[in-house]
Amino acid sequence: MTDTTERGYDRHMLEALVCPVTHATLRYDAEAQELISEAAGLAFPIRGGIPIMLLNEARQIRA
């Protein structure tokens, strides 16, 4: 058993991070390399293994 998700993202890091808008938990999208905040309707990119948790870098996932 390992503490990394598919493509090597650390599960412990994911558990420690929350949405900067709603403080809700995030879902890891391995294919898109994004952290998804369902509560805020935002997707935060992961670049070079580093989550970019800035609102101006987030992508809206719903209208």
UniProtKB/Swiss-Prot annotation:
GO CC terms in record: cytosol
What Pfam families would the database entry show? Trm112p
Matching InterPro entries:
Trm112-like
Transmembrane residues, as ranges?
none
- Family indicated by similarity: Belongs to the UPF0434 family.
What is the protein name given in its UniProt record? Answer: UPF0434 protein Pden_2369
